[in-house]
């Protein structure tokens, strides 16, 4: 009996030990799987200034590691960040920022108004900074950039350690939106060229700090000095830089880890999936969509000697566009049919239809003098989404006319040269709104605008834009822009076709990932759940 009892006890001990060992193994497997969440960023920035090119993806690091006076929240609203309060003067020209009491660099030093001012000085001093001119609305900033005056003449003034005031040349209702761009996030500007070697000495101001830099990516973790550290995820995040859409997607969809010469581990979050795969990924519930700040337009050659210069041709194209149909075929999360020239809200009036009218299109094609111009030349900047859009357009055109359709793709610089030469009838144009100003697109048609791609000429239109720029009354400015819209609508020099949303691919079990309207990912709340 005693032996039986001893045997039974030993069996129980062995079983329990086995369970314990197995549990440890399971925990080990689980730990290795959830030790970090991997986000593939595609591009691999050389520095953390990130102001030499107007690109979006590399700014993901700025929004992750640094923070500015204000920021865009997860609902697309501009909210205080390092500043706790913003006071605007009655004339709308001066903005006073009251800093939070509990803001510190990751190294422990207090963040002061003087540090904010020093950042703006470094930012404006950088001759290679493509964003510097966006601060020309600040009194004295343009002169300082052009070395006409010194920084003491720039109206960025420290009142005390926690108060900084910025005065503008003219009222700009979108000034707060401008400085919400991640490029204005506080950092020691000009000292971040070799950040991968010097990451331990960087003074971070954002929700994360760089924990480690390895061959397989950058590892970031919570900034323990951040004023909202309680709300920031405890997850470690690995940021990788695999720049092939196809390879990234293949790894993202694998249920096991990858070990190759160019990548190890798995990918949980990815942007910029291949266009031809988005619909399938969407149908498999792997795509999340967020409001964007860009619109696709078809712009026409204004030369009346070309097909594009014939208003009947432009009316025909506007009539045949099957925006709703093709947006569904590409991916409804990525593209939504555009019904207005400006960024759309619930209050935006629908000016353009989202459905095609083949009979109306044929009617106006018959009015076009196309005998001398048998080809319809459609040009676009080379990328897969652009190619897909113009191919869909050509299908619609072929249903309404026997004219030959010639599609030509170019690099960005080549496209501009082709437009300057007038070697096109239609050009597909993507316009990125910097700060949701409804007048931003209208201003792009002014003769002095760098964005006036098609060299539109209309003195009446120019005068309206000039008056809108200096109109202090918001309601009057809105009326002026409505007049601009009427001119463009009547002449149909351009047609909005799609609003571009920001889409992200996220594995099941990864929650609370957000993307800003300008396309940057927010990871401070990301969680992996069972």
What are these regions (language model features)?
Residues 332-368, 385-388:
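Structural transition elements
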Residues 132-189:
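Surface-exposed binding/hinge segments that line
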Residues 167-239, 246:
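Gly/Pro-rich hinge or "lid" segments in bacterial periplasmic/extracellular proteins
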Residues 112-114, 118, 165, 235-236, ...:
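Alpha-helical secondary-structure segments
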Residues 504-530:
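Long beta-strand-rich cores associated with HINT superfamily self-processing modules
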Residues 403-415, 440-507, 530:
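Extracytoplasmic/peripheral linker and loop segments enriched in polar/acidic and small residues
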Residues 225-279:
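Ligand-site clamp/hinge motif
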Residues 40-90, 121, 203:
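N-terminal lobe/hinge region of extracytoplasmic solute-binding protein
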